[in-house]
């Protein structure tokens, strides 16, 4: 399995995970899922508030659904 956990990675629910990092003075997040041994990057954004914004999480979920339909 993947060695995932805080403080760098947080499970947001279902199959969606969030990688946390900083880019200069900005807080950056990348939402991803795993398919076997592959990490699938779904959406990245600069975070401006404490909680992951709903539209960003929804976009990642939609992209994961599209991927699974293939």
Model-identified regions with their sequence ranges:
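Basic, Lys/Arg-enriched alpha-helical interface segments
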Residues: 1-27, 36-39, 46-70
């Amino acid at each position: 399995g993947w060695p995932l956990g805080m403080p760098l990675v947080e499970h947001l629910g279902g199959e969606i995970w969030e990688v946390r990092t900083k880019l200069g003075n900005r807080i950056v997040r990348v939402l991803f899922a795993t398919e076997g041994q592959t990490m699938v990057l779904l959406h990245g954004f600069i975070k401006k508030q404490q909680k992951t914004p709903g539209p960003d999480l929804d976009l990642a979920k939609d992209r994961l659904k599209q991927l699974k339909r293939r």
